[in-house]
């Protein structure tokens, strides 16, 4: 098939005597590639001809060429020079051409504002087109022309279109207002505000979605605007667009913290007074508790559960954030959001960049309460297809989830990873996680120490960075119980000369040996003797530690000296070694080393040995492994998240004294009676049945008078703005109105059918009955 | 707030760019800015104080999507938008995967789609049916030629060109007949067809303990894709036989209304064209009986035995392919064998294979046992080999593989045993005889067997 097509294509291409138009028609019909070749042949000379042609097809070919030039970053044709030719097509009959001109204007209008203004007239004319998509496009194009003198005109058109009968246009109004706001800022607040209020009260979920976006970007502080809509929005949450769902959750978190009473926590094991939900997620002092939510907050939290099946990762994470900010770990666990988050992390069809962000969120929750994900720890074992970043975050999560019961599995898994993984940064993270496992019990600690020693000394050609990290883990483990691990220290000291170690590994070993002076003084002098000749070749950190080791050794030697004579630095071997180190350090490049040398020199020269003992032999506290984050003080910066992730999880404070606010639903603006068609009610009618049923199931929600904000059927006729709108329309334009009436009548039958349908579609036979009614329709037509 | 969107191949050659303002940098300018940084390999690079460049690699053909945008409240938004854009392109062009050529040929459509999706620098529309309405897709001759074989007789009968093209006809009135926001109004097809594709990917880590395998960690990641070419506004009822899996945490397309039976019965008014109906994950380690855990791994199980033979230095890999009437053959079976570090002089020697051939690798830590395109079900391929020590150290301890990675795919049944019970269509125009197709595809993703 493909071959025959190629033959046809080549036949057409060889037909040189065909006119340009005929060739274009023929080859463009044949397939994209041949059309692309034809399109490529359009150059700077022939482009104006096409753009100015009387034939729509030629104009379209010309515009397609312009689009592909813009898209490919190709600068062989200067598109600015054809500005007028292109923009004059804004009045084309073909909507696609108009769209393409609009794309062009978006990018180039600012380069040529005077010419761009010429197009305004035809754009404004299409604002009253009968097709709502065209009206919306006109509004969009108008506002995309980024010229300050246009703003009053746009604002004027918006005031007219904000009550347009089509939700597509009203959505566009919200987006256009956002554009204006981004340009003009707070100065046009008085103009925008009434329109925003009307958009927020819209009955169409798609308009509410756009209005919420405008609200979040422009007036996020004006939460009081939402009082009357709060309950209705909770019920239509799952009908909004996915992006709007995430935005609404974000807005409502802020709203709940500002205006809703704080939840109370009651200890179920005793009769103590209920306390307020603590600011931080993990600070509830009772082992078993119940949380009592305000019923409006409960309404929001239960409406979130409808979103647990969302395929959108952003929505799932937003839902989890809402539970994290507004509720307790218990509610978080009961809500089922844990499963939804886990589903995202194991899915094979979600790209790794998104998985990584989901894992970062899980890491934040784990830090607050490890018990949330503890039973699912196996889900965080590394998989071969995981990227480096995913692996690192999984390891961090594992290091938090590790406990007595799962330690065995996790350690085994980590050992396997250490043996097969190639990436250095993952291996470093593995050693960090192991050090956390080692803190679980002394049994694990000794097992991990011997395993680490094995790994380091078996001559595997692994990265030096990894060796350094393993040595550091080893050092911190040994320090916990020095006497038990003398043999390990001896092995480590041998590594100083046998292995080619990084400075970041060498310096800690030398430091560790210095700490061992009191425990086992016999090892150190020999190590120091071997280090001194290499002094000048070492890294600054290592040099500093060598000097410290010499000083510690000397200080210990002085303390343990029991002779009658005063200790003489000049004659003792250790004293001489110290002098040598001092001599080397005094001429060091590094300021730090010289400074330390001077300080130590003056202490020992003036024979202030007590000070030296205090300074150099003080017992050091045992370091907590670096990964054991934030048990008490919650600090996200230790987790190494992306910066915007950190901002995202900043905890909002609860308002200590929320103002009394009235959340009785306010009037909804329903434009559906103005529409050409009524059939969408069959869908929303069906959903309304569902909504009024749903609250009955959960006792907490049923207390809300649900029908006042869900069913708006009865109210449609009472709306005042309806009459106003019609009088407005008839004054403005009479022809489209007549058109409307005709279509309205012709479709009214349909409405009756669909209304019946929504009434009967509660039982199982709904599909059957609707099938019957649709066939009736067929016959009546 | 988005400033520009770019698509490149994995070598950063520009395929398509879309700039939302006149000040937005072209990809060339941007490239020179991030050229010096290693961090360009990261998914997010900060360009200036409040501008970041987000990157997402998609699909086997490794298209890279880039978005330059101002930091917004939600850290997932830019990545999510890039994923949505990719999904929209897939659904819009109705393809399994996108090629660079397809994108270059359709630069105008890519721009128009983005023009509709982004407004005021924010995400406005992401629904693919709505986008197809705004940017109508004109089916070219090749589409007709492709479908001609099947429907030649039908196509000739209907002389009307609109029906000839077999594509939904966009009417001027947008809302006329639109029942649900996600479905294009007034779809008309000559052949009413609905295809349901169930895909499952096995991700599992197993350990060989003696002669038996134990599951360390595993999950099945499943997806239900639907291709729907139905006239009017039909309602579809899809009943699944879930074989005891709860599927509670599934992700569902917004069109799905759950019945009393949960995910097992889904009622929906489908969007037109291609879409993902549901995604689910089955945690294998949560299944309580050990035997059931292993049966849910699918048709192919691999075991690894070592320390065999006269010198106790041989290993044997045995692939047990279960028998099934629904599956014709296993496709693209490959087993990658990983060895611990072996010295340079040692040699991997294959003693015997019943199927396929051995491909060694320069890295010395792995080799691949590659099978033919198709392997019959019910067969038990075996490979036996050893790592020969160099002559200088003949008595070194024998080396055995540390783990195996298995990859394969087959059609016909799913590892979890989930099947479609019925697809019931209602509200179709009278007289239409819809065609319903169901396809099951299984794949091995991260399937590891450790020694």
UniProtKB/Swiss-Prot annotation, chain A:
What UniProt keywords are attached to this protein's entry? Cytoplasmic vesicle, Golgi apparatus, Membrane, Protein transport, Repeat, Transport
Main localization (coarse): Golgi
The residue ranges flagged as biased composition, category Low complexity, are: 759-774
What topology does it adopt in the membrane? Peripheral membrane protein
What does the entry give for GO biological process?
A: Golgi to vacuole transport; protein targeting to vacuole
Q: Which family does it belong to?
A: Belongs to the adaptor complexes large subunit family.
Compartment list? Golgi apparatus; Cytoplasmic vesicle, Clathrin-coated vesicle membrane
InterPro entries from the UniProt entry? AP_beta, ARM-like, ARM-type_fold, Clathrin/coatomer_adapt-like_N
Q: What is this protein called?
A: AP-3 complex subunit beta
Q: Where is the composition biased (Acidic residues)?
A: 746-758
| Pfam families assigned to the protein according to its UniProt record, in alphabetical order | Adaptin_N (PF01602)
Q: How does it assemble?
A: Adaptor protein complex 3 (AP-3) is a heterotetramer composed of 2 large adaptins (APL5 and APL6), a medium adaptin (APM3) and a small adaptin (APS3).
Q: Which residues form a coiled coil?
A: none
Q: Note the segments forming the HEAT repeats.
A: 113-151, 153-186, 187-224, 294-332, 521-559
GO cellular component, as recorded:
AP-3 adaptor complex; clathrin-coated vesicle membrane; Golgi apparatus
Where in the sequence does UniProt note compositional bias of the Polar residues kind? 699-712
Q: Which region ranges are annotated with the description Disordered?
A: 694-713, 731-781
Curated annotation (Swiss-Prot), chain B:
Major localisation:
Golgi
- Membrane topology type, per the record? Peripheral membrane protein
| CDD domains the UniProt entry points to | AP-3_Mu3_Cterm (cd09252)
| Stretches assigned to the MHD domain | 191-450
Gene3D superfamilies this protein is in? Answer: 3.30.450.60, Mu homology domain, subdomain B
Cellular component, GO, one term: clathrin adaptor complex
Pfam families linked: Adap_comp_sub
One Gene Ontology term from the biological process aspect of the record = Golgi to vacuole transport
Origin: domain of life: Eukaryota
Compartments annotated for it: namely: Golgi apparatus; Cytoplasmic vesicle membrane
What keywords tag this UniProt record?
A: Cytoplasmic vesicle, Golgi apparatus, Membrane, Protein transport, Transport
**What is this protein for, i.e. what is its function?**
Part of the AP-3 complex, an adaptor-related complex which is not clathrin-associated. The complex is associated with the Golgi region as well as more peripheral structures. It facilitates the budding of vesicles from the Golgi membrane and may be directly involved in trafficking to the vacuole.
Q: Which PANTHER family match?
A: AP COMPLEX SUBUNIT MU
Q: Assembly and partners?
A: Adaptor protein complex 3 (AP-3) is a heterotetramer composed of 2 large adaptins (APL5 and APL6), a medium adaptin (APM3) and a small adaptin (APS3).
Protein family according to the UniProt entry: Belongs to the adaptor complexes medium subunit family.
Question: What's this protein's name?
Answer: AP-3 complex subunit mu
Which organism is this protein's natural source?
Eremothecium gossypii (strain ATCC 10895 / CBS 109.51 / FGSC 9923 / NRRL Y-1056)
Q: Which gene encodes it?
A: APM3
